[in-house]
Amino acid sequence: MVRNPMASAVESTLKTKAQTSNLSFYYGAIQALKNIHLTLAEHRVTALIGPSGCGKTTYLRCFNRMHDLYPGNRYEGQILLYPDEVNIVGPEVDPIEVRMRVSMVFQKPNPFPKSVYENVAYGLRVRGVRNRAELDEKVERALRQAALWEEVKDRLASLAFNLSGGQQQRLCIARALASEPEIILFDEPTSALDPLATLKIEELMGKLKQSITILIVTHNMQQAARISDFTAFMYLGEVIESGQTNQMFDHPTNQLTEQYVAGHFG
């Protein structure tokens, strides 16, 4: 298997935000990920591509320990989160603490059955923020970061379900941003949206990466090429090749990668 590791490129020019080493993951007795090695560059967008069932979402969900919600799942290896080099899949690390540092936005918008305001404030309240002025400030900041404030500032008390699909997804992004995470995980965040809403989300990611590291799963090769700085191609639970996005798409070193980005299978 030929690889083009991102580690050397990232270490020489950029800070590392997360380093995956020898990561394997098991659903019970079934091995879903096999010895994953991947570096996430700080304040950059990394895209995970590959055919359905290759392990992209499984890998993504390791970063915020979502697999811990189901008994029998287990991790081997490590994902070090910098700068403190905490192994966020280590059994000694509290998943709640991990999720405060690593937020996630899902494929379909999933706002809570609450007001626009309370959707964003909910996580802050869970973390112990009670002061109304502080809540107001943090909610507004998150909504502004998600490019949604001007559209909802006069209907913060309205149910989130009254927003359009694209607005709901940006609300979910604001909810993820409210806890001031270091990494945001996006699992095909625009697959259920129309082209205009998709464009807004993509533009938003370009702004967010100035202060946050982003890892995104996408089946859309054009989207990966547009928005990501680095790309990793996965197949059958392994990272086959990874590197700078333009190199991955224009000059892949692995035949499987070349066939996939050319659309010969998927």
UniProtKB/Swiss-Prot annotation:
SUPFAM superfamilies assigned to the protein according to its UniProt record, in alphabetical order: P-loop containing nucleoside triphosphate hydrolases (SSF52540)
TM segment ranges: none
Domain ABC transporter: 18-261
Subcellular location: Cell inner membrane
EC number(s) per entry: 7.3.2.1
Cross-referenced InterPro entries: AAA+_ATPase, ABC_transporter-like_ATP-bd, ABC_transporter-like_CS, P-loop_NTPase, PstB-like
Self-association and partners: The complex is composed of two ATP-binding proteins (PstB), two transmembrane proteins (PstC and PstA) and a solute-binding protein (PstS).
Protein's UniProt name: Phosphate import ATP-binding protein PstB 1
Organism per entry: Gloeobacter violaceus (strain ATCC 29082 / PCC 7421)
